[in-house]
Amino acid sequence: MSERDILIERLERKLAEKERELVELRRMNREELEKIKREIAMEAKEEVLREVHKLLQNSQIQRLSEVDSKIVELRKAMESIITELAYIKGELKGLQEKGESKVERKEIIEEKIQKAMVFENEPLYLEEKEERKPAKESKRREHDVIIPEGKKEERTDDGEDGLIVCD
């Protein structure tokens, strides 16, 4: 073997070794690239999830504040209704003490109910399709009122009939 052949053989071994190193580096490079892709995908996914979570929290907070404001509005409406009922109850007791007739009390009650307003000028009751008539004209006639037979004869301790009149 000549020097040239020995040199070629040595160079071929070095070339084969370098090719193996190159294959190994390519494999490691692919693995590292896949790892980086997975990390980027996970970070992007986590970022999207955080943003969605923030949006959901903001949406829930907004809904809760809307519900809170509705609760406050309903509470105020209930308080005004209770105040109005207490006022009407006091008026009724005053009328009872004065001894006014039952018909006059009903007329006054009907007038008070028609004048009672809730939620910024909305009537306490649902209006019928017809226009409202003055309180004296809207008084129910005896045959329009449906009262169970047992209730007609019942009396309370105060001597009242225990019926609640509503329009």
Curated annotation (Swiss-Prot):
Skewed-composition ranges (Basic and acidic residues): 128-155
Region (Disordered): 128-167
Annotated keywords: Coiled coil
Coiled coil: 70-118
Domain of life: Archaea
The protein's name in its UniProt record: Uncharacterized protein AF_1557
Organism: Archaeoglobus fulgidus (strain ATCC 49558 / DSM 4304 / JCM 9628 / NBRC 100126 / VC-16)
